[in-house]
Structure formats: C-alpha cells, structure tokens
Curated annotation (Swiss-Prot):
HAMAP family: UPF0262. Signal peptide: none annotated. It comes from the Bacteria. Belongs to the UPF0262 family. It comes from Paracoccus denitrificans (strain Pd 1222). Residues 1-22 are annotated as: Disordered. This is UPF0262 protein Pden_1958.
Length: 162
C-alpha cells in the first residue's frame, strides 16, 4: 500500500437516495474502492495562499442538487475541503459506459473470447475518457493520477444514473 501523505485512506459513497446497483456494478464498485485504497495519488493544492493540511485524506462522494460532491477530510475527520462538480460533462460518458458494460456482461456469457476482448477494449476506452474528464474537472481542486481517476470514475458511475 502506498504510504504517501498524498493519498486517500478512506472512501465513503453516499448512495442512499439511489436504487440498489446491479450485482455487476456493485462488484465494480467494491473492486474500485479496494484498488483505490491499495494505491492512489490524491493531492490538494494550496488555495488562496492557505496551506492544506497534510493527508492522507478521507473522501466522501455524493450527488447533491444534481452536482457531484467531493467532501474531503483528514484521516482524523477534520474537514479540509468540499467541492462540487457539474454532472453535465460526465452524463454522456457514464451513459456510454453503462451501455458498453451491459454489452460486455452479456458477451461474457455467450460470445467467443475474441469478441469479448473487442468489447472490453471499447469499455476501457470509454472508461479512460471518463477518467480524463474527471482529471480536467478536478483541475485546481485536486490532483489525481490516471489510475486514481479511473477508479474514481467507476465510483462516479455508481452515483450517476446511466
């Protein structure tokens, strides 16, 4: 596990207002959280001349008033930052991601490996697009590497209706 202070040490997802996810989506979420906690890069830049308390950080993700909310606290629970991102830039990518995931889950049950691999490559491409969008939207608020962005995008998909 990464022991850097520039990381997430806890992740909470507030999905209380959402219908239960499918078993496949729930599994993706569990894997993303596990992988994030094992290895991630999450840095908060100083803002307006203020120092940022050192990490590691706890992240609470939620959707409130049609905005994606990142609520950041220190490991001990002291609030550090909260920022809201418009869901608009994510909607089409999330929709595309859900559609390709459905195709992938269906393909795994009935198609030959070559066709499954082609669908999986498309799925990864859409996933990467979502991760890059997240990195762009976080600019000036938080810095994450591409692997962290990919895993966070998986969690965002759990919060945004596809």
């Amino acid at each position: 596990m990464s022991q850097s202070a520039n990381r997430l040490c806890r992740i909470d997802i507030d999905d209380s207002a959402l219908p239960p996810p499918s078993p496949e989506i729930e599994q993706d979420r569990r894997v993303a959280v596990f992988d994030l906690l094992e290895d991630n890069s999450f840095t908060l830049p100083g803002r307006e001349g203020q120092d940022v308390p050192p990490g590691p950080y706890a992240l609470a993700l939620a959707v409130r008033e049609k905005r994606l909310v990142f609520d950041i606290a220190t490991e001990s629970g002291s609030k550090v930052a909260e920022f809201h991102l418009s869901l608009g830039p994510f909607r089409q990518t999330v929709k595309d991601y859900f559609q390709i995931c459905t195709s992938y889950f269906d393909a795994v049950k009935r198609l030959p490996p070559a066709q499954i691999e082609a669908i999986d490559m498309a799925r990864r491409g859409i996933h990467n697009e979502g991760a890059r969008t997240l990195q762009e939207r976080l600019e000036g608020k938080a810095e994450v590497d591409i692997d962290t962005a990919r895993r966070l995008f998986t969690l965002i998909c759990a919060l945004v209706p596809g």
